[in-house]
Regions:
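Short, well-ordered alpha-helices that flank and scaffold nucleotide-derived cofactor binding pockets
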Residues: 4-9, 147-150, 181
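Conserved hydrolase catalytic core segment
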Residues: 1-33
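Non-transmembrane alpha-helical segments in soluble domains
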Residues: 67-71, 149, 176, 180-183
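Conserved loop-alpha-helix segment in the C-terminal half of the alpha/beta-hydrolase fold
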Residues: 113, 120-163
């Protein structure tokens, strides 16, 4: 999101290329796509999430369990194997207050300060070559990624088959190779 806003609003000189990895140009489109993903969940999980959204109570254990399943399906594993990189296995400090303020209680209910982030119509203003990366099961759904690809004139889209929001973890060798080749081609 930040790179989109920066390139569109400030039109900085000296930027040779941009990389948008599982980002989005529109909070409303993002929310719409998360709600589409929700329809693929069990009826029980859908009901728990719908109840939380309707009441504003995001503390119910049924909701929390449903949201965990949603995030595991579309973001990342809730636990990693012992041999995973340390940055994935160490205990995380959650920035719940900042996340709630900026975005909202979850990925599909944007109520924070970014809820009105809408840049689809301004994507053609991005002139820098832009690499867009996403996974097939990503929070950044193929529709969200394709919207950026269609809107940014000089863009390339790499879709990671079977990957979620953290494609850089799920297929790290391909991800690193892709970024290295992109930067060699555009930023040297």
């Amino acid at each position: 999101m930040l790179i989109i806003e920066y390139l569109v609003n400030y039109k900085p000189e000296g930027i040779k290329s941009a990389i948008i990895s599982s980002g989005h140009p529109s909070s409303s489109l993002w929310s719409q796509e998360q709600h589409r993903w929700l329809k693929l969940m069990s009826a029980e999980d859908q009901a728990a999430i719908a109840k939380a959204e309707a009441t504003g109570d995001f503390s119910d254990p049924a909701y929390l369990a449903a949201n965990d399943r949603f995030m595991e399906r579309h973001c990342c594993p809730l636990t990693y194997p012992a041999d995973a990189p340390e940055c994935l296995t160490r205990e995380k400090k959650h920035g719940d207050e900042a996340y709630l303020y900026g975005w909202g209680p979850n990925e599909y209910t944007p109520t924070g300060t970014l809820k009105d982030f809408e840049y689809i119509d301004r994507l053609p203003e991005i002139k820098e070559p832009t690499l867009i990366i996403s996974g097939t099961y990503d929070l950044c759904s193929p529709l969200v990624a394709k919207t950026m690809y269609d809107g940014i004139p000089n863009s390339r889209w790499e879709l990671f088959e079977g990957a979620r929001h953290m494609c850089f973890v799920e297929d790290n060798p391909r991800y690193v190779k892709l970024l290295s080749e992109w930067m060699r081609e555009h930023d040297d």
